[in-house]
Amino acid sequence: MKYDNLLDRFIKYVKVNTRSDPDSETTPSTESQEAFALTILKPEMEAIGLQDVHYNPVNGYLIGTLPANNPTLTRKIGFIAHMDTADFNADNVNPQIIDNYQGGDITLGSSNYKLDPKAFPNLNNYIGQTLITTDGTTLLGADDKSGIAEIMTAIEFLTSQPQIEHCDIKVAFGPDEEIGVGADKFEVADFEVDFAYTMDGGPLGELQYETFSAAALEVTFLGRNVHPGTAKDQMINALQLAIDFHEKLPAKERPEYTDGYQGFYHLTGLTGTVEEARASYIIRDFEEASFEARKVKVENIAQSMNAQLGTKRVLVELNDQYYNMKKVIEKDMTAIELAKEVMEELTIKPVIEPIRGGTDGSKISFMGIPTPNIFAGGENMHGRFEFVSLQTMERAVDVIIGLVCKA
């Protein structure tokens, strides 16, 4: 009974295209996210017994409350998941359900793609389980619709079993996490909890309270275009300036060469002509000092190139995006200790590792609500090879229920 609607709920959610748009200036960045909140999630939240369900058109958050049914459970706990999906095709998501996976390749629909354990050895962790995959033409959207489905399923179970005592619970579904702005307008006053959890992690047992600190870097290169036949000592090729700039960054400090606590510079876009070029980067690191040092390094490279060119032709624009939430959460580890205790009681081994990324919890933690991250089940996220285990999603439901009953 506890999990009866989990799979159907998840399938229903992922079939709705809620891809966010980094170029949009609206909140949410796409109309489909608001429609998803208002036409699908809000009625369902009300139907399963959440109270004071309301949508804030200013920040795109849909919030509901389940009051405590035991006055001695005085903590207030929140659960957060994001509605948008990543920058990959999300039109006509057509999930495949693989019952009792027995190993080997999984053909993704009628496409030429397959999930191969040689390329994706994480498949070997799911022998005997029910896997939900893509058909090879889209992402799946388990990031983070598995989190939404898990929260909904846990609430539905609690309201159907009033004899199960629980604390005050707040639920929030928000927009635009994948483009890094989802929590920018989050209203703490509308989410009065002692701490919260984003249900936005990956495999079973993930419990995370360290994220990258993150910055966006835009570098504009100003060239001088003349006819290539008479270009000697006159032409300044903006594209070549971009190449020179990139080559001055440490070659081994890129995502493809780093892991664990190592930071990186990541070139995400390069456009331009001889006259003008633009390079987009993201900068990531865990430690505050090394994060700041990376930003200083790119400024110094630009200054050095401009000095050599004799004029300002390399223009740097740096914007911090979010910070490592460890700085906030380690001041009071209650949320982590509670989650560890609940997982261990459920015979789930907590896997406490840094997130090589960020969550909405990064920003929300700095707003005053410690918000670590818990597994939601997704694997190979953000692309056609994404999949999720139904059994892992069920365990996430168990963790949510355990947290609110133990609070």
UniProtKB/Swiss-Prot annotation:
Disulfide bonds: none annotated. Keywords: Aminopeptidase, Cytoplasm, Hydrolase, Metal-binding, Metalloprotease, Protease, Zinc. PROSITE patterns: ARGE_DAPE_CPG2_1, ARGE_DAPE_CPG2_2. It is an enzyme of class 3 (hydrolase). Its main location: cytoplasm. Pfam families: M20_dimer, Peptidase_M20. InterPro entries: ArgE/DapE_CS (IPR001261), Bact_exopeptidase_dim_dom (IPR036264), Peptidase_M20 (IPR002933), Peptidase_M20_dimer (IPR011650), Peptidase_M20B (IPR010161). Zn(2+) 2 binds at D143, E178, H382. One of its GO terms (molecular function) is zinc ion binding. Zn(2+) 1 binds at H82, D143, D200. It is found in: Cytoplasm. One of its GO terms (cellular component) is cytosol. Binds 2 Zn(2+) ions per subunit. It catalyses: Release of the N-terminal residue from a tripeptide. Its EC number is 3.4.11.4. The active site is at D84, E177. Its cofactor is Zn(2+). The keyword Nuclease does not apply. One of its GO terms (biological process) is peptide catabolic process. Cleaves the N-terminal amino acid of tripeptides. Belongs to the peptidase M20B family. This is Peptidase T. It comes from Streptococcus pyogenes serotype M18 (strain MGAS8232). The lineage of its organism: Bacteria, Bacillati, Bacillota, Bacilli, Lactobacillales. The gene is pepT.
